[in-house]
């Protein structure tokens, strides 16, 4: 039987920072998760770890891959978008970039 790859994460897109008409709150990012299209489906992802993986030019501890970690905090609206808070705010160049929503910690 051939080995199949299994992902422990779901792909997501960084949409924007949370904002009002005049003020932008970069501490909270809006994230659209693939396959999540309602507020009820978004409830499953609350508390899950989320990360942005990127590459740099200078290796640190032998690796050029770096990660910014965060957690999914609450739903945003009725269309499956969630709010996420990261340890370091995501830079604006990540708008539209791919994120990973880990399927842990599990609350099932």
From Swiss-Prot:
What is the disulfide pattern of this chain?
Answer: none
InterPro entries according to UniProt: Ribosomal_eL33 (IPR001780), Ribosomal_eL33_CS (IPR018266), Ribosomal_eL33_sf (IPR038661), Transl_B-barrel_sf (IPR009000)
Spell out the Pfam families in the cross-references: Ribosomal_L35Ae
* Native source organism of the sequence: Schizosaccharomyces pombe (strain 972 / ATCC 24843) (Fission yeast)
Query: Family, per the entry?
Result: Belongs to the eukaryotic ribosomal protein eL33 family.
Q: Which GO terms describe its biological process?
A: cytoplasmic translation; ribosomal large subunit biogenesis
Q: State which residue ranges cross the membrane.
A: none
Q: Per its record, what are the GO molecular function terms? A: rRNA binding; structural constituent of ribosome; zinc ion binding
Name the record gives this protein = Large ribosomal subunit protein eL33A
Subunit structure as annotated in this protein's UniProt entry: Component of the large ribosomal subunit (LSU). Mature yeast ribosomes consist of a small (40S) and a large (60S) subunit. The 40S small subunit contains 1 molecule of ribosomal RNA (18S rRNA) and at least 33 different proteins. The large 60S subunit contains 3 rRNA molecules (25S, 5.8S and 5S rRNA) and at least 46 different proteins.
This molecule's function is given as: Component of the ribosome, a large ribonucleoprotein complex responsible for the synthesis of proteins in the cell. The small ribosomal subunit (SSU) binds messenger RNAs (mRNAs) and translates the encoded message by selecting cognate aminoacyl-transfer RNA (tRNA) molecules. The large subunit (LSU) contains the ribosomal catalytic site termed the peptidyl transferase center (PTC), which catalyzes the formation of peptide bonds, thereby polymerizing the amino acids delivered by tRNAs into a polypeptide chain.
Q: Which gene encodes it?
A: rpl35b
Per the record, GO CC terms? Answer: cytosol; cytosolic large ribosomal subunit; nucleolus
List, alphabetically, the SUPFAM superfamilies matched: Translation proteins (SSF50447)
Any remaining note in the record?
A: There are 2 genes for eL33 in S.pombe.
Q: Which UniProt keywords apply?
A: Cytoplasm, Nucleus, Ribonucleoprotein, Ribosomal protein
- Localization (cell): Cytoplasm; Nucleus, Nucleolus
